[in-house]
């Protein structure tokens, strides 16, 4: 990207992508999250949004569309979409302030 200052939304997208690549490939294939990398990302970066999800193993299985026991970026993006929908619902109901 250019050296220009990013907007708040652009910075948020940059963070979502960078976070994936920070955790992806630490143990398994580069560019995808294995179960341990997914759990580490979830517990470190999404502890509040995933607190009621139940088993992270089960959540990974539902996200892992091609059933290869790893999450590619497109599968990870499904999680981000699901979480964004929940945040939107909470905001619409006045539950979430920020």
From Swiss-Prot:
<dbReference type="GO" id="GO:0005507">
    <property type="term" value="F:copper ion binding"/>
</dbReference>
<keyword id="KW-0106">Calcium</keyword>
<dbReference type="GO" id="GO:0001819">
    <property type="term" value="P:positive regulation of cytokine production"/>
</dbReference>
<keyword id="KW-0963">Cytoplasm</keyword>
<keyword id="KW-0446">Lipid-binding</keyword>
<dbReference type="GO" id="GO:0005829">
    <property type="term" value="C:cytosol"/>
</dbReference>
<feature type="binding site">
    <location>
        <position position="37"/>
    </location>
    <ligand>
        <name>Ca(2+) 1</name>
    </ligand>
</feature>
<feature type="binding site">
    <location>
        <position position="68"/>
    </location>
    <ligand>
        <name>Ca(2+) 2</name>
    </ligand>
</feature>
<keyword id="KW-0597">Phosphoprotein</keyword>
<feature type="binding site">
    <location>
        <position position="70"/>
    </location>
    <ligand>
        <name>Ca(2+) 2</name>
    </ligand>
</feature>
<comment type="function">
    <text>Plays a role in the export of proteins that lack a signal peptide and are secreted by an alternative pathway. Binds two calcium ions per subunit. Binds one copper ion. Binding of one copper ion does not interfere with calcium binding. Required for the copper-dependent stress-induced export of IL1A and FGF1. The calcium-free protein binds to lipid vesicles containing phosphatidylserine, but not to vesicles containing phosphatidylcholine.</text>
</comment>
<dbReference type="GO" id="GO:0032730">
    <property type="term" value="P:positive regulation of interleukin-1 alpha production"/>
</dbReference>
<dbReference type="GO" id="GO:0062023">
    <property type="term" value="C:collagen-containing extracellular matrix"/>
</dbReference>
<comment type="subunit">
    <text>Homodimer. Part of a copper-dependent multiprotein complex containing S100A13, FGF1 and SYT1. Interacts with FGF1 and SYT1. Interacts with IL1A.</text>
</comment>
<keyword id="KW-0813">Transport</keyword>
<dbReference type="GO" id="GO:0015031">
    <property type="term" value="P:protein transport"/>
</dbReference>
<protein>
    <recommendedName>
        <fullName>Protein S100-A13</fullName>
    </recommendedName>
</protein>
<dbReference type="GO" id="GO:0005615">
    <property type="term" value="C:extracellular space"/>
</dbReference>
<feature type="domain" description="EF-hand">
    <location>
        <begin position="18"/>
        <end position="53"/>
    </location>
</feature>
<feature type="binding site">
    <location>
        <position position="66"/>
    </location>
    <ligand>
        <name>Ca(2+) 2</name>
    </ligand>
</feature>
<keyword id="KW-0677">Repeat</keyword>
<dbReference type="Pfam" id="PF01023">
    <property type="entry name" value="S_100"/>
</dbReference>
<feature type="binding site">
    <location>
        <position position="32"/>
    </location>
    <ligand>
        <name>Ca(2+) 1</name>
    </ligand>
</feature>
<keyword id="KW-0653">Protein transport</keyword>
<feature type="binding site">
    <location>
        <position position="75"/>
    </location>
    <ligand>
        <name>Ca(2+) 2</name>
    </ligand>
</feature>
<keyword id="KW-0479">Metal-binding</keyword>
<dbReference type="InterPro" id="IPR011992">
    <property type="entry name" value="EF-hand-dom_pair"/>
</dbReference>
<feature type="modified residue" description="Phosphoserine">
    <location>
        <position position="32"/>
    </location>
</feature>
<feature type="binding site">
    <location>
        <position position="64"/>
    </location>
    <ligand>
        <name>Ca(2+) 2</name>
    </ligand>
</feature>
<dbReference type="GO" id="GO:0008289">
    <property type="term" value="F:lipid binding"/>
</dbReference>
<dbReference type="InterPro" id="IPR013787">
    <property type="entry name" value="S100_Ca-bd_sub"/>
</dbReference>
<keyword id="KW-0186">Copper</keyword>
<dbReference type="GO" id="GO:0005509">
    <property type="term" value="F:calcium ion binding"/>
</dbReference>
<keyword id="KW-0964">Secreted</keyword>
């Amino acid at each position: 990207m250019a050296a220009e200052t990013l907007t708040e939304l652009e910075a948020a997208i940059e963070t979502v992508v960078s976070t994936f690549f920070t955790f992806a490939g630490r143990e398994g294939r580069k560019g995808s999250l294995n179960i341990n990398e997914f759990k580490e990302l979830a517990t470190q970066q999404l502890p509040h949004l995933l607190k009621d999800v139940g088993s992270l193993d089960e959540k990974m299985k539902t996200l892992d569309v091609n059933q290869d026991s790893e999450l590619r970026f497109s599968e990870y993006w499904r999680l981000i979409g699901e979480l964004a929908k929940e945040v939107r619902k909470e905001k619409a109901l006045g539950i979430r302030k920020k």
